[in-house]
Amino acid sequence: MNFSTYFENLSVPNNISGNITFPISEDCALPLPMIFTLALAYGAVIILGLSGNLALIIIILKQKEMRNVTNILIVNLSFSDLLATIMCLPFTLIYTLMDHWIFGEVMCKLNEYIQCVSVTVSIFSLVLIAIERHQLIINPRGWRPNNRHACFGITVIWGFAMACSTPLMMYSVLTDEPFKNISLDSYIGKYVCLEDFPEDKFRLSYTTLLFILQYLGPLCFIFVCYTKIFLRLKRRNNMMDKIRDNKYRSSETKRINIMLLSIVVGFALCWLPFFIFNLVFDWNHEAVATCNHNLLFLICHLTAMISTCVNPIFYGFLNKNFQRDLQFFFNFCDFRSREDDYETIAMSTMHTDVSKTSLKQASPIA
């Protein structure tokens, strides 16, 4: 994924991210009110992303009865979002507004790398959640993942994410090449962080591959899983309505799946503008007006980073006990286990047998 900030009115050697331009004209500078608005928006996302995901992680890990497959994957998703909040937002905002990199060569390589790892882990955490829901509802008598499987899956997706992101670490460089032919004193000793791929074709292939691996492919798979789930639940509810009143159980099942699907939809909508922006700009630099590039980039990037807040927001709105524990969290109170009345979001303990039109329950899900 291409997270580099591209600038205007200054040619770059062909071997550095392919004829990228840099802004040296004051006419292209963002107005102060716009900078203030962007900084305020980024700050709000950082605060919400940090506090929300940190609270969600602590609350789930603190409660033993919440340590099931779905919640383990939710914690992994929140940790990935937390990492993105720390590594993506502040560095990208400062870099884009300053038009040069001030954080050194190590952070230049790590910033690109960690951002790519984070989004890969996030989407594949959603894939694993979809698989768990699919097996639970579509094939309840077959194989179902347990906590050990969830931990193994998390290890695999982190390894896969790191492998996919390695080219960004390899080819991210700190260079002053773009500023060497500029006579302005303000650009002396300034550096930019760019992706220096060996060939333009390699960069385009890699960017397109990441779009498929990080966005299109996983979302298509998730869509198929949840479509099958909702069709099965609809048929099951129709059967149960004819036999007995099971409105409470049906509403709980519906609420849980709506929450999980909302997280997926939120992720997809937030990241779509950013992926489109990168693809369009990578394949045709002239498609984006030079003076509008930085503003469009920041808006698309900010929209993508809002996804780091989606997880705790949807989890909180649709889980009453999370709201209650969240109040304890911000009041620095101790969390105490409530085994009798604690609501868990996962249905991993529920066993269903649709063929006999019965519902057997090993332990409460709510």
From Swiss-Prot:
Domain of life (superkingdom): Eukaryota
Q: Which InterPro entries match?
A: GPCR_Rhodpsn (IPR000276), GPCR_Rhodpsn_7TM (IPR017452), NPY1_rcpt (IPR000351), NPY_rcpt (IPR000611)
Where along the sequence do coiled-coil regions lie? none
Q: Name one GO cellular component term.
A: plasma membrane
Looking at the UniProt entry, the stretches that span the membrane are 40-60, 83-103, 112-132, 150-170, 204-224, 261-281, 295-315
Glycosylated residues are N2, N9, N15, N181
Here the disulfide bonds are C108-C193
Report what the protein is called: Neuropeptide Y receptor type 1
Source organism per entry reads Xenopus laevis
**According to the entry, what is the taxonomic lineage of the organism?**
Eukaryota, Metazoa, Chordata, Craniata, Vertebrata
Q: Which gene encodes it?
A: npy1r
